[in-house]
Regions:
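N-terminal export/targeting and maturation segments
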Residues: 6-66
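Sec-dependent bacterial lipoprotein signal peptides
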Residues: 1-4
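Acidic, small-residue rich beta-repeat scaffolds with periodic aromatic anchors
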Residues: 90-167
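Structured domain cores in non-transmembrane regions
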Residues: 40-117, 121-125
Length: 167
């Protein structure tokens, strides 16, 4: 069996990073989220692999229900669809703020203006919601934004990243 040097690029399994972050909610309370990401997909020769899939999971305060969200790999993008910006909760309902991951994702998700995609968990699944349905109480970015390379490795080493280090 022959294989060219380029045939396997982006097809090999890559490592997974995982860490926890303490998220400061709008009311001053905190919750811990677990984040993990895998690497792979299309990229230029000599460049690191992009984030292929990004997952968060958390238990809402005062509940025992674990909630999970994944920004999955998209073949048309060659990477994950979204970059996470914030995790919020109001009256037991979680919300997410994400941004499309580069121009192809921005186009795929309808060129939102401002360039954010909002999600609300309806008790069974995550649903995209319009900006106007996103609670006005949420005004902050409350998760680590730089999660690749050395900065990602630093997050993993810290165990639980405190909310003070994220702000």
């Amino acid at each position: 069996t022959e294989m060219s040097a380029c045939e396997g690029v982006g097809a090999l399994p890559f490592e997974r990073d995982s860490w926890q972050e303490e998220v400061l909610l709008h009311d001053g309370s905190k919750m811990v989220i677990t984040r993990s990401q895998t690497y792979g997909g299309r990229h230029e020769v000599g460049q690191p692999s992009p984030i292929k899939e990004h997952t968060i999971s958390f238990t809402l305060p005062n509940t025992d229900k674990t909630i999970r969200w994944t920004s999955e790999y998209s073949e048309d993008l060659g990477r994950t669809n979204f970059q996470l910006l914030a995790v919020h909760a109001l009256n037991g309902t979680p919300y997410l703020v994400t941004e499309p991951n580069l121009c192809l994702s921005y186009n795929k998700w309808g060129r939102p203006n401002p360039p954010y995609v909002f999600f609300k968990y309806d008790g069974a699944a995550w649903q995209r919601i319009p900006r106007g349905a996103f609670p006005h109480e949420f005004t902050t970015i409350n998760v680590a934004l730089s999660t690749i390379g050395r900065k990602g490795a630093d997050l993993v080493k810290q165990g639980v990243v405190s909310s003070e280090k994220i702000q």
